[in-house]
Amino acid sequence: MKAVFRSAAPYADDAMNLPVQDVDAAIPYYEKLFGFRVLSRQDAPHKSVILARDGIQIGLAENGGDPTQEGCFFEVDDVETAFAELKSNGLEKEEAGFRIDRHGDTSWKVFFVVAPDGLCYCLGERQI
C-alpha cells in the first residue's frame, strides 16, 4: 500500500531548488525510497533535476547551498502508511517517532527523514 503525497512545501526558500552536492548521486535515493521519478534534467545555470510523484514536484540542484539547512514538508494522506512504505523501500529507521506538531489552527501527525545528502524531510498528515 502506498501513501498519496498531496503537497510539498520548502522549509526555507524553494522546493524546486533544494541544494545537494551531487545530483546524480542523490537521484537513486529519491527514486527508491520516496518513489519519485525524474521529470527533467538541466545543466545550466547549474546541474539540477525535477522529480515528481503523485502530482507534486521537487527539484534538486547543485547550487552551492547547504543541504543541512534545507528540506521540505510533504503532506500525505496517511502518515503511518507513508512510514510503512518508506520502510519497505529501505528506510533505515526502526521507529517513526511520530509526534503531533501544531501550526496555526492545524495539527499534524509527523515524522522526519534525513536524506544522505543532508536534506531533512517532514512527512505529515493533517489531524481532524
Regions from the language model: what does each represent?
Residues 17, 37-42, 100-101, 128:
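Conserved catalytic-core motifs of GNAT/GCN5-like acyltransferases
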Residues 22-23, 72-120:
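Vicinal oxygen chelate
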